[in-house]
Amino acid sequence: FKSLKERKIINLKSPIILICSKNLLIKQMEKLNYRFSIQILNRKNIKKKYLNNKKINLIDVNFNFKKPFDKISKKSKTYIEECVNVALNLIKSGNFKTLINGPISKTHFLQKRMPGMTEYFAKKTNSEGNEVMLIFNKDLAVSPITTHLHLKKIFKKITKRNIVKHVEII
């Protein structure tokens, strides 16, 4: 919400699609006293021409919750998995190229099967070895040469070839 509020949703250059529970989003907006217009999208037929850059474009994923802000637990794993799968299907459709994920509990979602979401998305999109992370704010953008690695393994991955490949991907 903070990013949306700071950028003033009415001035977005590109539309944003949120994939989450409509009811949860509304309850969280009420709690934070935010007001944004929401446009519900049909997840079966999403095309760029249907998107509105003056509203939150929302793909609704059902989630039963008690409190709008609660600790992440195992019960949210299925919900997160469905949201991620919807996002991956949008990317695989070829209509969308960019995916920005919010905070996801690696402990509950990945359950130590992978080091991070970057590697998870790379595996699901058959692009292992070509994954990059971009960390940015309004003043700075950084893209680490490696993704989630133990410190002792990082030095082996920082080579001229890997740096060039990384820059080409970005």
Regions found by a protein language model. Name each.
Residues 1-170:
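Anion-binding alpha/beta catalytic cores of soluble intermediary-metabolism enzymes, centered on
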